[in-house]
Amino acid sequence: MSVLRPRHLMSIAAALALTAGGTASAASAQDSSAALREVMFVGNNWDGTADVINSTGDFGKIGRINVIPDKAERIAAINADPIKWIYFMAIRNSVGEGHDQFVDDMYSTPDGKSMVVSRPSFADVVSIDLATGKINWRFPVAGYRADHMAVSPDGTRVAVSASTANKVQVLDINTGKELGEFATGDKPHENIFTKDGKYIWNMAIGDVNTSLDDPAWDWTKGDRHITIVDANTYKQVKIIDMRDRLDAIGLKDFSDAVRPAVFTPDESKLYFQVSFFNGFLEYDVAADKITRVKTLPKNPATSEDRTTWVNDSRHHGISMNPSGTKLCVAGTMDDYATVVDRATLQEGPLVTASKPYWATVSGDGKDCIISESGADQVTAIDFATGQKVVSVPVGDHPQRVRLAHIPADWTGPSAS
């Protein structure tokens, strides 16, 4: 997303450091910045690891982090609390598809020394020291499940969805201290900071784990809306319920659960996916209306039984190249990904992929990176040609992929 560019954050941080002190401190800051390298974190949800890969080129693997070094301690605490145990098992047997969800989202700290991770089944956010693999701090979220996160443009704050508590909590990324929180709709999911850092957008997706998936039962899915808040006061600025906007253009049978979304570089348009739909929609922010709908091809081999689609997601994952001319869409249940021209909405080649669950952008902006959760690999697709570039094996059930910065000589924690 254009609003979440860690490679830009490091440049800003370095520039501020260089102007804050004398020659010695400036040189120190410059050396510190130069000692970091841009990478990608890949969260392997079902095995509790995060792979670190190159952010461009061959996307080769650099190292791996165990994001659940405290697993025994956490499991013991869950087993000692009947309510926590019930939720833990419910996550495993519903949204986890029979697996525990150990890592959802990840970001690096501004100094590149730590990885901050949200862990759904453990209902927390932890900071892990990249040098030692040990936990720096742990923040238990409200309720019983942690979900998507977002990092502020200056890299100092991280917002995490506490999905069973219907709220977002904002933390100091260095200390884990809670700075504020705000209420959302049912089951908050995606979070996006605007690029000026003034606002946070949260998308609540409702109860995606039930089998009442026919449009006639849509009302059972809960209160699904976008919440926009002031990123400094955490006060509500606006609520956007896509139900009204969908109905206005005749899409009464569409779900209003906004899934992955991405802004244009100027943030005038939002492109978003909704539950059960093979495609995406364009929303004009100023006009407050849906302006275009793009339906993407169905895979003939995909069952039309909605209850077989993972967590109500037919398509889940969307990103945009830095110039805002191309979109990349993960056609999750249809087993492909494709690059779409934003002006014409014409899709390119359908690149075969196994349950792609996320889409992001390479460090140089040339490629779309998708996580193939069904094949345990990430795949790069050239924005210019729409063709596959390379696939790289990772861990069990990769989902979120994020740009990050780590020490240049890092190859893994010393404890591994």
For each predicted feature, which ranges?
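Bacterial N-terminal signal peptides that target proteins for export
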Residues: 2-12
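General helical structural elements
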Residues: 9-11, 22, 318
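Sec-dependent N-terminal signal peptides
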Residues: 13-17
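C-terminal segment of classical bacterial N-terminal signal peptides
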Residues: 18-26
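Short amphipathic alpha-helical segments with coiled-coil-like heptad repeat character
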Residues: 1-4, 58-60
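Predominantly soluble domains enriched in secretory-pathway, periplasmic, or organellar proteins
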Residues: 26-416
